[in-house]
């Protein structure tokens, strides 16, 4: 059967039937990834990302052998497919599920790592390739190419580490790795686009400041656009109260507004990653509380499922695309050069990562008075390690820069594409497989005291895992009475922090307009909704 399927691949671009066959096989592979990923969940070396990648590699080898070297993949890679359809649900769900208190408590450190650190890493990689590539015969690259390579390989993929870390045992570390990963992706894409749009043939101090100003402009406006879209969705749902007639409308509106935020950012040439991430944070803080109970459950699982499928799709495809015969044919005459380029890039990634993680961690610790909030050396090693893996963002940016309509006719471009694939595969598989043992060694399981401070220790967390401990809705309807299990957290932190003043502003001005915690929709006749008027009469 597989022979007949693969035999149809050469005519994939011209035959609708062949496209359907390829899609069927790809969906079957996605199912296999999910099943095997579940079975290998407790494995010391494997995780779902590596499983999908290896299945993609195995499938690529099989197709390559059966098609006698004509093809290794089912679908043609498209950066539009990645940036428009696959990336938005992943980033939005990251913002929607984020532990907001931990994220904003460590916001300065996250921005140091995610924004400043990414620029440092990009600079070091760019300087390194400028020096090393000139000694290798790989083609003619200009300053813009070297800077673009720096931006491409500054984009991290911390999925493997996040799948291993326990955010209840190490909330600080998880928050830093998670937050930095999102900001890093956004920064890399913004820097890459800024480099692409600037004429770097006459680079001077004025142009450098202009480039920095453009970066800050994109960063700020993208964040504001995401927050504004989230607030609009909260206001509309709160005022019109769709759930009174249909929870389907609530769910549909939340999904469409989330996607609209990303597309608006692309329309205005902003950073869609930052926009949809902060839209997710705002919607989880306001909009999610304004919908009915059934809509809350549905949206939570829908966004998580879409994100999971998109991630699996990406790793599966990267595995298959790694064996694309057309890309490797261009560099087959000089395999040593391709290996040297890949090794140089991998070394620069490691050096560039270390160049900012340890110094910025030191600076961050200087500003922290509480010992529990400081980043110890073992945590710094984990943060450094989590950013060594490269994934789909690097692949997509490399395709954008070094291919034309999916083809790599220029030898230098082909070398960069194959080197990017090699770095992504090596870092994801090798570093990813070593992640569990490394974290087990550096971070032995914490005792119960750390989990007491986590957000999900009550049965209520089964239904509402998105919120932190001070964001749960009280069953009695009295939202001013503090919960008993939050007293410990209250006593162990300063009472006049930025978070304190934000809560004052939020409770006084934002929530009365946009809803949020405390706004409890009630659908007459629905026994599943919270706080019905009088359950005894039901």
Curated annotation (Swiss-Prot):
Name of the molecule in the record: Sodium/hydrogen exchanger 1
Record keyword Membrane present: yes
Cellular component aspect of the GO annotation: endoplasmic reticulum membrane; Golgi membrane; plant-type vacuole; plasma membrane; plastid; vacuolar membrane; vacuole
Segments passing through the bilayer: 20-40, 46-66, 107-127, 217-237, 263-283, 303-323, 343-363, 379-399, 414-434
PANTHER family cross-referenced by the UniProt entry: SODIUM/HYDROGEN EXCHANGER, SODIUM_HYDROGEN EXCHANGER 1
Tagged with keyword Secreted: no
Intramembrane region positions: 74-94, 147-166, 172-192
One GO MF term: sodium:proton antiporter activity
Record InterPro entries: Cation/H_exchanger_CPA1 (IPR018422), Cation/H_exchanger_TM (IPR006153), NaH_exchanger (IPR004709)
Oligomer status and interactors: Calcium and pH-dependent interaction with CML18/CAM15 (increases when pH decreases, better at pH 5.5 than at pH 7.5).
Other remarks on this protein: Inhibition of Na(+) transport activity but not of K(+) transport activity is mediated by binding with CML18/CAM15. Inhibited by the diuretic compound amiloride and its analogs ethylisopropyl-amiloride (EIPA), 5-(N-ethyl-N-isopropyl)amiloride (MIA), and benzamil. Also down-regulated by quinine.
Technological use: Transgenic plants of agricultural interest (e.g. cotton, Brassica napus) that overexpress NHX1 have enhanced capability to grow on high saline soils.
Tissues where this protein is expressed: Ubiquitous, with higher levels around vascular tissues and guard cells.
Domain of life: Eukaryota
């Amino acid at each position: 059967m597989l022979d007949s399927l693969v035999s149809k691949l050469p005519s994939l671009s011209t035959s609708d039937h062949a496209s359907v066959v390829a899609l069927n096989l790809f969906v079957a592979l996605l199912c296999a990834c999910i099943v095997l990923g579940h079975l290998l969940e407790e494995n010391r070396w494997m995780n779902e990302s590596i499983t999908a990648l290896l299945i993609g590699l195995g499938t690529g080898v099989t197709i390559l052998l059966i098609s006698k070297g004509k093809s290794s993949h089912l679908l043609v890679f498209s950066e539009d497919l990645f940036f428009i359809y696959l990336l938005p649900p992943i980033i939005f769900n990251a913002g929607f599920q984020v532990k907001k208190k931990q994220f904003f408590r460590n916001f300065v450190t996250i921005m140091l790592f995610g924004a400043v650190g990414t620029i440092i890493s990009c600079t070091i990689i760019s300087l390194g390739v400028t020096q090393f590539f000139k000694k290798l015969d790989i083609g003619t690259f200009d300053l813009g190419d070297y800077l673009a390579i720096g931006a491409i390989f500054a984009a991290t993929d911390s999925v493997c580490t996040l799948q291993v870390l326990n955010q209840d045992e190490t909330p600080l570390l998880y928050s830093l790795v998670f937050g930095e990963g999102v900001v890093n992706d956004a920064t890399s894409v913004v820097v890459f686009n800024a480099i692409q749009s600037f004429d770097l043939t006459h680079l001077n101090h004025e142009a450098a400041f202009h480039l920095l100003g453009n970066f800050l402009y994109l960063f700020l406006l993208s964040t504001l656009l995401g927050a504004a879209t989230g607030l609009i969705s909260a206001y509309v749902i709160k005022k019109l109260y769709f759930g009174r007639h249909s929870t389907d409308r609530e769910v549909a509106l939340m999904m469409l507004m989330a996607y609209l935020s990303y597309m608006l950012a692309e329309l205005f040439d902003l950073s869609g990653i930052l926009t949809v991430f902060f839209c997710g944070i705002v919607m989880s803080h306001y909009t999610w509380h304004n919908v009915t109970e059934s809509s809350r459950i549905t949206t939570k699982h829908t966004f998580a499922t879409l994100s999971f499928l998109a991630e699996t799709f990406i790793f599966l495809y990267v595995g298959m695309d790694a064996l694309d015969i057309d890309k490797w044919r261009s560099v087959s005459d000089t395999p040593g050069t391709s290996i040297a380029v890949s090794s140089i890039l991998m070394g620069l990634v490691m050096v560039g990562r270390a160049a900012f993680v340890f110094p910025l961690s030191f600076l961050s610790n200087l500003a922290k008075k509480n010992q529990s909030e400081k980043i110890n050396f073992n945590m710094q090693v984990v943060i450094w390690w989590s950013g060594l893996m490269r994934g789909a963002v690097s692949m997509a940016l490399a395709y954008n820069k070094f291919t034309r309509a999916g083809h790599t006719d220029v030898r230098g471009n082909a070398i960069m594409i194959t080197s990017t694939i090699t770095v992504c595969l090596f870092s994801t598989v090798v570093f990813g497989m070593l992640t569990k043992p490394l974290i087990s060694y550096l971070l032995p399981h914490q005792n119960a005291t750390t989990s007491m401070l986590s957000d999900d220790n009550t049965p209520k967390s089964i239904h509402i895992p998105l919120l932190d401990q001070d964001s749960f809705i009280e069953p009695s309807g009295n939202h001013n009475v503090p919960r008993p299990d939050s007293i410990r957290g209250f006593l162990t932190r300063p009472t006049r922090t930025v978070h304190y003043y934000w809560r004052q502003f939020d409770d006084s001005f934002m929530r009365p307009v946009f809803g949020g915690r405390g706004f409890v929709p009630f659908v007459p006749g629905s026994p599943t909704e919270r706080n019905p008027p009088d359950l005894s009469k039901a």
